[in-house]
């Protein structure tokens, strides 16, 4: 009896469970009663572009890690610099003073900072980008092109040498110092003529791209600048008595008639130019002529520097050749003396031998 009662109880329990399951399936469940989905954690991993290869990805990752490391060092060393400043480049170099201070140059958008350690003492140099007035490429001992000279508005000059990648650092400084413009191939300086941008917007680009004729300077000026008209040529002769050509009136008239009424000056330098106190010439024309002179003098100075460098190299080459020849001659003489000593020792009789 007990076994039958137990089996009936188990059957009733199974029927109740089946009834509950069917009821739960038939009963509609609203969307509000469904549990909310678990939000996935954000993905902080780096996503590289599809075009990059494995080696390039590794290189970018290493550069990012090193820049992050240098950024922490930068803010730890220079606490006055705002935390928003991000290091763009760190380069190993030496600051030239009484002796070379080996350290690192930290370049950020608004600051140029140098740090060196000498006998446990920290040496720091902080240069605001706004105060930079000139950046010039420098040669260490006039031979090694591995330096940069930075001049500030307080006339302080900082020379950084032993730069392994000087050109890349120079290009980065040119992008950072937006208030500077290239004055030559090897230097950056403050923009000139900042007070009159309207009067020089047309003149300066035209003067840069327009070549100067060596025979006459007045022909290279733009057409919209007034200068001496042909009718006032006789009046200009009084300003230039030394440049007056030895020609008669008939020869001048003949030359003018051959050229259709226009004056053609046979010798260079005799043409009409704008004197210092000429009412028809505007001051912009004078500035244009001065700017042309500066543009012509720059390549001459660079050529002279190159000739001077070549001469120094020749002198050093001759000295090196002389040292090599003298050392070889001394080695030859030493070997001859050794041979003579050996021959004398062989010729001497052995002591105690008869």
UniProtKB/Swiss-Prot annotation:
BP term (GO), one: regulation of store-operated calcium entry
Keywords from the named record: Cell membrane, Endoplasmic reticulum, Lipid-binding, Membrane, Transmembrane, Transmembrane helix
Domain GRAM: 72-139
GO molecular function: phosphatidylinositol binding; phosphatidylinositol-4,5-bisphosphate binding
Source domain of life: Eukaryota
A Pfam family matched in the record: GRAM
Region (Disordered): 1-46
Localization: Endoplasmic reticulum membrane; Cell membrane
PANTHER family, A to Z: GRAM DOMAIN-CONTAINING PROTEIN 2A
UniProt remark on domains: GRAM domain is required for specific location to endoplasmic reticulum-plasma membrane contact sites (EPCS). Mediates interaction to phosphatidylinositol lipids and binding to plasma membrane.
Function: Participates in the organization of endoplasmic reticulum-plasma membrane contact sites (EPCS) with pleiotropic functions including STIM1 recruitment and calcium homeostasis. Constitutive tether that co-localize with ESYT2/3 tethers at endoplasmic reticulum-plasma membrane contact sites in a phosphatidylinositol lipid-dependent manner. Pre-marks the subset of phosphtidylinositol 4,5-biphosphate (PI(4,5)P2)-enriched EPCS destined for the store operated calcium entry pathway (SOCE).
Name of this protein: GRAM domain-containing protein 2A
Organismal lineage: Eukaryota, Metazoa, Chordata, Craniata, Vertebrata
